[in-house]
Amino acid sequence: MTFRPLHDRVLVKRVEEESTTKGGIIIPDTAKEKPQEGEVVAIGGGAIKEDGSVRPLDVKAGDRILFGKWSGTEVTVDGVELLIMKESDILGVMA
C-alpha cells in the first residue's frame, strides 16, 4: 500500500538511535527515548494559503529532519511505524 499525505503534512520514518553508548554500555529498550530525528518518506502537495494558492513545502522525500518530542501522529503502514506531522512541527533539516 502507498500512502500520500495531504496538504502540508509530511510522512516521516524515525531514525533509530544506537543501543550502545560510546563507553560500551548497552542501553535497554525500556530506558530508550524515542528518537527526535527522522527521514522524510513522503510529502503532501503543499500548504493552502488564505488566498487559496498553494505554497510548496520546504522539505522533500529523503531529507533528514529534527522534530519536537511530541510532534506527529504515529501510524503503521505495511508493518512499518511512521509519523505523520505538519511541516510546522519540523525544527530543521540536517545538512
Curated annotation (Swiss-Prot):
Record-linked PROSITE patterns: CHAPERONINS_CPN10
GO biological process: chaperone cofactor-dependent protein refolding
A GO term for molecular function: protein folding chaperone
Record's keyword annotation contains Translocase: no
Major localisation: cytoplasm
Pfam families: Cpn10
CDD domains tied to this protein: cpn10
Subcellular compartments: Cytoplasm
Keywords in alphabetical order: Chaperone, Cytoplasm
GO terms under cellular component: cytoplasm
Quaternary structure, from the entry: Heptamer of 7 subunits arranged in a ring. Interacts with the chaperonin GroEL.
Functional summary from the UniProt entry: Together with the chaperonin GroEL, plays an essential role in assisting protein folding. The GroEL-GroES system forms a nano-cage that allows encapsulation of the non-native substrate proteins and provides a physical environment optimized to promote and accelerate protein folding. GroES binds to the apical surface of the GroEL ring, thereby capping the opening of the GroEL channel.
Family, as annotated: Belongs to the GroES chaperonin family.
Full protein name: Co-chaperonin GroES
Gene behind this protein: groES
